[in-house]
Amino acid sequence: MLKQRTIKQIVKTVGIGLHSGRKVNLTLRPAAPDTGIVFCRVDLPTPVDIPASAMAIGDTRLASVLQKDGARVSTIEHLMSACAGLGIDNLYVDVTAEEIPIMDGSAASFVFLIQSAGIEEQNAAKKFIKVTKPVEIRDGDKFARLDPYFGFKLKFTIDFRHPAVDKTGQALEVDFANTSYVREIARARTFGFAHEVEMMRELGLARGGSMDNAIVLDEYRILNNDGLRYDDEFVKHKMLDAIGDLYVVGHPLLAAYDAYKSGHGLNNALLRELLAHEDSYEIVTFDDPLKAPRGFAYDTQTAFA
């Protein structure tokens, strides 16, 4: 049987919120089978648990934000991406503010945390959402689409008219049957434009943003002294985001995802469209792990190649 996974022990870290600029304590705790990924606002007078789900995503303008009973947890996508990449099904995420710390702007810190805690298989079958019919959402020239596929592959195209981005490749296709999430995707950082950062700060946002946790561009070039971690880091980060956004559905997808200029809002709309049509998916498990598709969340020995 292909089994569900959690972490072996509690791990903690401290970081800053990208938008608030304030210190945030983050604790990851093991969770029982069929718990899912649950975010806990432990700083509130009465702590609020918010299970990750497509229907709990509220605001998507700058990040994916979970909302429940007036409580929010923002910027969950990088941590969710790491959980997807390492095949973590069940986890409690305790946080002392309304946003997950930005760390270095990628998923690498969360991958390291989960690997440090250790990954434990549980005595329950891992559930997958198998897409059985195409589902698509469009918004002007932007689109996001899921097609049936026995595995998990993604194709993402960005369109940033900028000299530095133009040089790096605006499209990427990855099949996790033969690609390592940890090596090829996890280290891609978020990016932004210097003039936008100034505007956001005037609105009280991006107070924690810096070259320590983002690639910053002016009109012509990358301002970070250390340059890029991957030749195509921009589109890889958008793919990292999409993996995290899609994992909010509650289980790993067996599907092919294709997107053009998609973001958090379109990705969430795609999941809602999928869930609204019960004939477009089914929940499946694998009694024989050898019959499961090869892929980054399914390898029983390690979660990554």
Curated annotation (Swiss-Prot):
Zn(2+) binds at residues 78, 237, 241. Keywords: Hydrolase, Lipid A biosynthesis, Lipid biosynthesis, Lipid metabolism, Metal-binding, Zinc. GO terms for cellular component: membrane. GO terms for biological process: lipid A biosynthetic process. The active site is at residue 264. GO terms for molecular function: metal ion binding; UDP-3-O-acyl-N-acetylglucosamine deacetylase activity. Its cofactor is Zn(2+). It catalyses: a UDP-3-O-[(3R)-3-hydroxyacyl]-N-acetyl-alpha-D-glucosamine + H2O = a UDP-3-O-[(3R)-3-hydroxyacyl]-alpha-D-glucosamine + acetate. The keyword Metal-binding applies. Its EC number is 3.5.1.108. Transmembrane segments: none annotated. Pfam families: LpxC (PF03331). Pathway: Glycolipid biosynthesis; lipid IV(A) biosynthesis; lipid IV(A) from (3R)-3-hydroxytetradecanoyl-[acyl-carrier-protein] and UDP-N-acetyl-alpha-D-glucosamine: step 2/6. The keyword Ion transport does not apply. Catalyzes the hydrolysis of UDP-3-O-myristoyl-N-acetylglucosamine to form UDP-3-O-myristoylglucosamine and acetate, the committed step in lipid A biosynthesis. Belongs to the LpxC family. This is UDP-3-O-acyl-N-acetylglucosamine deacetylase. It comes from Paraburkholderia phymatum (strain DSM 17167 / CIP 108236 / LMG 21445 / STM815). The lineage of its organism: Bacteria, Pseudomonadati, Pseudomonadota, Betaproteobacteria, Burkholderiales. The gene is lpxC.
